[in-house]
């Protein structure tokens, strides 16, 4: 008779979970950050708020963002004027948009990842879908399964309302699934659309205005599996270690609340300080076992958040400017896409491999993927690059 331990042993993969393919997508509507304040105050009928507009202009100028992509166009906003007010009941209008567009944008990213993977979609065994943009039943995971034509018995996991740290959370979950289910191939999708948070300005809620200056739309997908098939699957990054923690004394630092007016956004001014204060301990727990204490010796995949956060983290750790360059490039080209950001960054690193590098980690062996968001919660993923 076979023992339980023998069954468990047979169920486990031999090697570490590995990212096998990456895909990203954005809506076609591209917004120029330099002209966005004029557009934003005009479309929300707020041009009379001249002092607040000047303040918003400064926010946009300091954001280090050049452009963002948004599903919500001027035409859509004219059809749904309640979304342009600061606090008008508008959840129905927002939900009508996101329950359709979140899975649709996720599909675009997933199709690209599956194509790069090169295997039939019938080999996908698990699906993880993550979004902070709306809630519905059946969820976006179900809708994506239908849109992609995945097998009806694919094992699905739906993650709603996680926020900006979730790009690390989904990889942590995918790692556990891949390593504990021999032969598993996990499709991971993060899809974010700002239709749920867009609203007009208010001089009493400046942190909401910060969100209007930073957030953009995007979807990202990865295929994760252990024991890549030689000559068929191309390993990109191994997921070696993961952790999540709540930063002490950080309650209320970043909050989002779903209301009749949509998803409201709140953050404290000291978010950059809280993140930089706690990142050292998180990195120490991750890299001390590897005898790594020089964080300039690893490659970085950091959630961009905003320029002030990146500046304080770099200063705290003594990072060279090039360590955060790719993160700043993603912020510049796309804005803050919440959970999707870190995968866009991974995709940029993968593309740079074609430029004569020896490993998928910019010629470095080890790397960190670092995310932070509501809670304030921190996600840490240790990555191991793969020889090209």
From Swiss-Prot:
Organism of provenance: Vigna unguiculata (Cowpea)
Q: Specify the protein name.
A: Chalcone synthase
Q: Which domain of life is it from?
A: Eukaryota
Name the Gene Ontology molecular function terms of this record: naringenin-chalcone synthase activity
Which cysteines bridge via disulfide bonds? none
Catalytic site positions: 164
What biological function has been recorded for the protein in this entry? The primary product of this enzyme is 4,2',4',6'-tetrahydroxychalcone (also termed naringenin-chalcone or chalcone) which can under specific conditions spontaneously isomerize into naringenin.
The similarity annotation says: Belongs to the thiolase-like superfamily. Chalcone/stilbene synthases family.
Write down the top EC class of this protein: transferase
**What InterPro entries does the annotation carry?**
Chalcone/stilbene_synt_C, Chalcone/stilbene_synt_N, Chalcone/stilbene_synthase_AS, Polyketide_synthase_type-III, Thiolase-like
């Amino acid at each position: 008779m076979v023992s339980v331990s023998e069954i468990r042993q047979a169920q486990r993969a031999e090697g570490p979970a590995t990212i096998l393919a990456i895909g990203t997508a954005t809506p076609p509507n591209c917004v120029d950050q330099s002209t966005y304040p004029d557009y934003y105050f005009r479309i929300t009928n707020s041009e009379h708020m001249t002092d607040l507009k000047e303040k918003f202009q400064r926010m946009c100028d300091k954001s280090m963002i050049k452009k963002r992509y948004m599903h919500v166009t001027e035409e859509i906003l004219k059809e749904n004027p309640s979304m342009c007010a600061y606090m008008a009941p508008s959840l129905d209008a927002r939900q009508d948009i996101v329950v359709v567009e979140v899975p649709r944008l996720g599909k675009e990213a997933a199709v690209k990842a599956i194509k790069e993977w090169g295997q039939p979609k019938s080999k996908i065994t698990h699906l993880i879908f993550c979004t902070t943009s709306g809630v519905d039943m059946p969820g976006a995971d179900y809708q994506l399964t239908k849109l992609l034509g995945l097998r009806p018995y694919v094992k699905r996991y739906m993650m709603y309302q996680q926020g900006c740290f979730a790009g690390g959370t989904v990889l942590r979950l995918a790692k556990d699934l891949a390593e504990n289910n021999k032969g598993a191939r996990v499709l991971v999708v993060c899809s974010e659309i700002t239709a749920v948070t867009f609203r007009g300005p208010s001089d009493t809620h400046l942190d909401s205005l910060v969100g209007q200056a930073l957030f953009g739309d995007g979807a990202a997908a990865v295929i994760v599996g252990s024991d890549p098939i030689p000559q068929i699957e191309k390993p990109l990054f191994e997921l070696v270690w993961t952790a999540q923690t709540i930063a002490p004394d950080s309650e209320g630092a970043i909050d989002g609340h779903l209301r009749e007016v949509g998803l409201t956004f709140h953050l404290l001014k000291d978010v950059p300080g809280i993140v930089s204060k706690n990142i050292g301990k998180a990195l120490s727990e991750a890299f001390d076992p590897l005898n790594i204490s020089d964080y300039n010796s690893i490659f970085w995949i950091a959630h961009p958040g905003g320029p002030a956060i990146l500046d304080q983290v770099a200063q705290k750790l003594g990072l060279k400017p090039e360590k955060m360059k790719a993160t700043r490039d993603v912020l510049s080209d796309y804005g803050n896409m919440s959970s999707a950001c870190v995968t866009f960054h991974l995709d940029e690193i993968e593309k740079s491999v074609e430029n004569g590098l020896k490993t998928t980690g910019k010629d470095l062996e080890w790397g960190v993927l670092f995310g932070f968001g509501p809670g304030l919660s921190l996600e840490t993923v240790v990555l191991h690059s793969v020889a090209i």
